[in-house]
């Protein structure tokens, strides 16, 4: 939380905190110098600060708790273009030229849960974003954990049929060996990919309430 609070850049004119360039977002297909306010990082920073503020308050660190909560409440809004969430505020072509790798827009609500994660998400825009990802994203470029991320996004919207479809979809990196480990079968140098297993387990726990 100390790092996040220090890393964010305050704009006194708008009274918001931004993630400024250069930065490499979770979708590592963007030039660091062009990336500003990546959507997942905005949501995750806010999420982390709110958790830290709660813990700090409970431990008696009230000054830190107040500071972190205030920053969380003034983090830049999630970037939107044409009624869908986009990768970052300088990426209006998210769904044309950048529809590859991790669909980080879906992580802001599907993966994050509680601690006000839902407060900054417009459910209609989020649903539009999910459907846009399913429609245009290059699934061959997804990683093993992305399929469960998409499934969790669908589940949060009450679309469990789509969630299960995404968990079971036939795609090069949504593959499992006899041991149960996720593998990226298009990568000879990556026989096992444990983030895929972690994501699958989290999605299953959410969807089946276990």
PLM features: what roles do these ranges have?
Residues 2-58:
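Acidic/histidine-rich catalytic neighborhood
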Residues 39-209:
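Active-site core of glycosidic bond-cleaving carbohydrate-active enzymes
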């Amino acid at each position: 939380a100390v790092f996040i609070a220090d890393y964010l850049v305050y704009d006194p004119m708008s009274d918001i905190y931004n993630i400024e360039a250069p930065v490499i977002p979770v979708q590592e297909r963007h030039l660091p110098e062009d990336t500003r306010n990546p959507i997942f990082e905005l949501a995750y920073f806010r999420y982390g600060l709110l958790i830290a503020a709660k813990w700090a308050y409970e431990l008696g660190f009230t000054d830190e708790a107040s500071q972190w909560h205030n920053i969380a409440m003034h983090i830049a809004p999630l970037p939107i273009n044409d009624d869908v969430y986009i990768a970052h505020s300088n990426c209006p072509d998210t769904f044309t030229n950048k529809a590859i790798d991790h669909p980080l827009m879906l992580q802001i609500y599907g993966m994050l849960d509680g601690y006000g994660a839902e407060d900054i998400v417009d459910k209609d825009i989020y649903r539009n974003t999910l459907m846009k990802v399913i429609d245009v994203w290059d699934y061959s470029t997804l990683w093993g954990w992305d399929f469960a991320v998409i499934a969790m996004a669908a589940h949060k919207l009450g679309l469990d049929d789509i969630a299960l479809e995404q968990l079971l979809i036939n795609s090069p990196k949504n593959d499992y060996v006899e041991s149960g480990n996720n593998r990226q079968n298009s990568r000879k140098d990556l026989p096992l990919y444990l983030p895929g297993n972690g994501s699958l387990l989290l999605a299953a726990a959410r969807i089946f309430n276990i």
